[in-house]
Amino acid sequence: MAPAMDSAQNGHQSRGSANVLAIGTANPPNVILQEDYPDFYFKVTNSEHLTDLKEKFKRICVKSKTRKRHFYLTEQILKENPGIATYGAGSLDSRQKILETEIPKLGKEAAMVAIQEWGQPVSKITHVVFATTSGFMMPGADYSITRLLGLNPNVRRVMIYNQGCFAGGTALRVAKDLAENNKGARVLVVCAENTAMTFHGPNENHLDVLVGQAMFSDGAAALIIGANPNLPEERPVYEMVAAHQTIVPESDGAIVAHFYEMGMSYFLKENVIPLFGNNIEACMEAAFKEYGISDWNSLFYSVHPGGRAIVDGIAEKLGLDEENLKATRHVLSEYGNMGSACVIFILDELRKKSKEEKKLTTGDGKEWGCLIGLGPGLTVETVVLRSVPIA
């Protein structure tokens, strides 16, 4: 006779919602101020003769509201790999060679910070979820980080390649399902990005390149996710209440990217900003309706900083006070757009600032919050969060 349903589920499922138990971040040591970046960029790409294009790029950088960014690529590395700095040159091999090593390496740095905060042995990690849009290989970066960290060989791995900037939300959604449906699971989530795949020299016929070069940067973030925390050894940071994914209507082709011999080439339509802005409230309503929440200013936020204009558009459509996006704008200013890692950096900034400012909770003193991932598709990931009290 088969066991009763409740009995069967109790053997395999956790009873509570997934929790963020620890957060770690990492960046390459090479930092370039945004005000210096146009000179650097046009020098290393041998494009200083394109004076009009450089002036346009300077204006884009000023409008970005980014102060500095971290990069693996340096002038010396680009000299050693000239194809990466030349628009349209066959350079996929050079890019891949860098990324196959550097993505797991940077991911490991972030993971070690999270594991140290968690305070438990790595033998307790049961699952790995790794997300990146920076290169591809078999076995994947999930395998590499498992080996680098010395995790159990029977750890269950999920590799998320090439989903773009919304993949931080995707990784959290997948980790939530794993943690809640596997009793005792502890999931290591890693999101790592490196501009070695998207770096290109300027081209007068592909101005989208300039937008990306003014915004993209390198970084990795990691979390430990688990349900039913073992208190007091484990200390929850946020509760993950629900997770949703939505394709924005009539947005086909608004953001697309393709891999060619020149690396990843990306294309942006002018209607990206209004498409996100005009549809964000419907995504929020779908996520929060069952909790009776419709006052968007009552929430704390981690919004993917896909550019100043996108953040501004979402703030306007939701009627958000500027304070609600302080952490999002801080990450945009101090790190730029690190793709999938950004929303986790913002969660880290939120909980740290909340403690520094003596707020009552990890969510800037608020109880409920929302993580919003944005990217190609157009795709929106919404993760409903609850903060925890700060002791």
UniProtKB/Swiss-Prot annotation:
Coiled coil, from the record: none
Gene Ontology MF, one: acyltransferase activity
Active site: residue positions: C165
Record field: pH dependence: Optimum pH is 6.5-7.0.
Catalytic activity: benzoyl-CoA + 3 malonyl-CoA + 2 H(+) = 2,4,6-trihydroxybenzophenone + 3 CO2 + 4 CoA
InterPro entries tied to this protein: Chalcone/stilbene_synt_C, Chalcone/stilbene_synt_N, Polyketide_synthase_type-III, Thiolase-like
Gene Ontology annotations of biological process type: benzoyl-CoA metabolic process; malonyl-CoA metabolic process; polyketide biosynthetic process
Gene3D superfamilies linked to this entry: 3.40.47.10
Tissue: Expressed in young fruit pericarp.
Thermal dependence of activity, per record: Optimum temperature is 30 degrees Celsius.
E.C. designation(s): 2.3.1.220
Source superkingdom: Eukaryota
Sorted UniProt keywords: Acyltransferase, Transferase
UniProt effect for mutating T133L: Changed substrate specificity
Function noted in UniProt: Type III polyketide synthase involved in the biosynthesis of benzophenones and xanthones. Produces mainly 2,4,6-trihydroxybenzophenone together with minor amounts of tetraketide lactone, triketide lactone and diketide lactone. The preferred substrate is benzoyl-CoA, but can also use acetyl-CoA, phenylacetyl-CoA, hexanoyl-CoA, cinnamoyl-CoA, p-coumaroyl-CoA and salicoyl-CoA.
Membership in a protein family: Belongs to the thiolase-like superfamily. Chalcone/stilbene synthases family.
Subunit structure: Homodimer.
Name assigned to this protein: 2,4,6-trihydroxybenzophenone synthase
Originating organism: Garcinia mangostana (Mangosteen)
